[in-house]
Amino acid sequence: MANLRQTPLTCSGHTRPVVHLAFSDITESGYYLISACKDGKPMLRQGDTGDWIGTFEGHKGAVWGVALNPQATRAASGAADFNAKVWDAIKGEEIHSFQHKHIVKSVNFSTDSNYLCTGSNEKLVRIYDLNKPDAAPQVFSGHKNGIRHVTFFNNNIALITCGDDKTLRVWDRNSGQEVKRLDFPAIPNSMEVSKDGNIITTTHSNIVTFWNSRELTKLCEYTAPTQMNSASLHPDCSIFVCGGEDLKMYKFDYATGTEIESFKGHFGPVHCVRFSPDGELYASGSEDGTLRLWQTTVGKTYGLWRCIEQTPAIQENTAVLNNKQEVPAN
């Protein structure tokens, strides 16, 4: 298995760079993947195959952030048209549109799907009650520059944000007050909270760092070969993957930081990386306008990947064919 070649599935359809992606939880019908693109058209796909399901049309500018609720019945998007939108992910119809005063960079649902949080270039975080969409949102202020990422945390009683002011902040939802903070030497390009909520993964420059989410203490930190724009930790915390400016996807051992393997498939820098909820694959989005799905265990039968176990005879014949010299045609 270790010597098999990684063959990613390429998901086309977007016409501009893919800048963000997100998976749903595992549902009765599988799990789903949504992508954000500068073409302004978020796309929904079957998560394990990459098959296109539909496109959410309505934004009038680049889409920077997307999210699916756990059940994959609702989608959200934030865009350069100063709007955050909530969609019926089954019908593809717009349900809500929340006007902002600047570009919306990040959106996320609460785990109960009743609330939407947004982060924007206004330097503000907002929480909207989706059962009372006309009500004024709860607003959190404190960042000195635009907000790149925001997510609910700790059973929805807290929020985590990171922004262009080189900080990561934890907020108490009830009081709206900042309760913890991290300062970075450079702008954090990505932020991910592990499925169990215990680990925060961040990237800045060529550094991938893992933090204890409760105390914001550093668990481990690794230096990558190039600037890393995004990283994702496997659900079982055994490995992590990351991608960045050199077009490659990297896989590392979480405990030691040892590079396990790297693959080149994209034709532009990698902007976003995420593991599927079952950990069997990871998805990447790139400047080249495509998403690619990569197997965590190369050669395993899963989704559209089919593995044929080779008998010794087949392996011997394959070796003969591989060593056979080609004869030029007359």
Residue ranges and their predicted role:
Residues 7, 17, 29, 52, ...:
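WD40/WD-repeat beta-propeller blade-loop signature
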Residues 7-11, 51-56, 93-97, 134-140, ...:
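A short beta-strand motif characteristic of beta-propeller blades
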Residues 11-40:
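Beta-strand-rich domains and repeat architectures in extracellular enzymes and scaffolds
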Residues 11-18, 57-63, 98-104, 140-147, ...:
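WD40/WD-repeat beta-propeller blade N-cap
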Residues 22-30, 67-72, 108-113, 151-157, ...:
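Loop/turn segments within WD40 beta-propeller blades
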Residues 36-39, 77-81, 118-122, 161-165, ...:
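Conserved strand-to-loop turn within each blade of WD40 beta-propeller repeats
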Residues 42-45, 84-87, 125-129, 150, ...:
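WD40-repeat beta-propellers
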Residues 259-262, 267-269, 277-280, 287-330:
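Terminal intrinsically disordered, low-complexity extensions flanking WD-repeat/beta-propeller proteins
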